[in-house]
Amino acid sequence: MVEVTRPPTKAWATLSPWLPSRGPDADYWWRLTGQHLSNMVEAAGYSTDQQYVALLFHYHWIVPYMGPAPGPDGNLKWKSLLGVEGSPIEYSWKWNTAAGKPDVRYTTEAIGSFTGTLLDPLNQQATLEMLHRIADFVPTVDLTWTNHFFATLYDHDRSKYAKEAAAGAHFTTTVVVAAEWLKNGLNLKTYFVPRRLGQSDGKLPIALWEESLKQLDPNSESRAAMHEFLNNDPEGKLLSPFMLAVDNVVPEKSRLKFYFQSPHTSFASVRQVMTMGGRIPVPESQLQELRSLIAAVTGLDSDFPEDSEVPCISEYNPAAKDNFVEIDLLLSGYLYYFDIAPGATVPDIKFYTPVRRYGPDDGALAKGIADWMTSRGRGEYSQRYLDMLADLTEHRKLEDGKGMQTYVSCLFKKSHLDVTSYIGPEAFDPARFLKHKAHTTRSTRRRSDSH
């Protein structure tokens, strides 16, 4: 059972009593993640109707696929890559512009009865079922490209995957789904982490990615520009692909997002990737804004050398070692995605800094980005963000650790920087179970004292 230490939002308090139990597992996830989501959409200024829609969608379509609740000791059936400790969900808060409001999104890995077994070694059946049920219910959802990548980025002989598992191969997350609650409604995305037979280091050769991509759009000018950068630029050659995302809309409107990891964290390397070696014109003022954002969330001095690597803690969560064994590149360096849009000549590029490893504790990090927003006329929701984070971390104080905030990303727009904070619920953090155990013990003692 999840212990709640703060009053719920009005939307949660109104809806929850009328939603029937779905069993102990789903009830656990609804109480934890449903309240997290309700806090986020309220803090982001969503209308009451929008809050109800987001919560009801989560209850009916996401929570039933979140898998077993953790045991009393925090053990779990399947560890997702979405959280370093195995949480199957990650939230995001896209910061407001000076005249707008934040957007709330979350990404989740569906977990089913056969997850991790010989029947479903890559854990894809629950996601497929969830997506097709949603597509039957939401008319704007189109799974054409999603079905293509399920067919082309994986092998389909389960017996051979079973042999690899018996020989000691480590299988983990291969597909996740994002629900993005924009002011005009729901957007769904599917993210693919390929795992082919014989692939044990988390890296699928770029040629195999391209085999799948060119079947959809053999003459993409934007993708060709990306490959030119990857093949010829010194920084581009260091980028390792690890994930692909698609919008679940009709193919002519869908975009491809190709995710890469770079071992470099110097701002000189960031500049080179974000401009694609000078191919993409980015004003120097925007580059310096990004540099100041990185400094704000990682605790760097404003004059930190542009060609120096950002210092990081050696090991921020021991649980990550075992979970990321085949894709440990995600535990270091910077991340980027290349957005391949229909008809574009060059990709849009988004930058991610993994603040769960770089920078100060969660309290200082949150204050750093809130102050950065305020100093640029975008601070209307800064205090709401800080209060919302405190609501999500009922098991500890923000300043007592790091890892609740996982990434900060930036995408250049014409007039501003699109900035997003990514938040992990720490659903399997030992502190949650210790706190609940103490709470349960106190409650038991009070009951026994009354007899």
From Swiss-Prot:
In a knockout, what does one observe?
Abolishes the production of (2R)-annullatin F, (2S,9S)-annullatin D, (2R)-annullatin G and (2S,9S)-annullatin H, and leads to the accumulation of (8S)-annullatin E.
Gene Ontology terms, MF aspect: prenyltransferase activity
GO BP of this protein: alkaloid metabolic process
Pathway(s) this gene product operates in, as recorded in its UniProt entry: Secondary metabolite biosynthesis
Residues that span the membrane, as ranges = none
For this UniProt record, the keywords arranged alphabetically read as follows: Transferase
What is this protein's function?
Cytochrome P450 monooxygenase; part of the gene cluster that mediates the biosynthesis of annullatin D, an alkylated aromatic polyketide with a fused dihydrobenzofuran lactone ring system that exhibits potent agonistic activities toward the cannabinoid receptors. Within the pathway, anuH uses dimethylallyl diphosphate (DMAPP) to prenylate (8S)-annullatin E to produce (8S)-annullatin J. Geranyl and farnesyl diphosphate are not consumed by anuH for prenylation.
UniProt name for this protein: Prenyltransferase anuH
- Upper taxonomic lineage: Eukaryota, Fungi, Dikarya, Ascomycota, Pezizomycotina
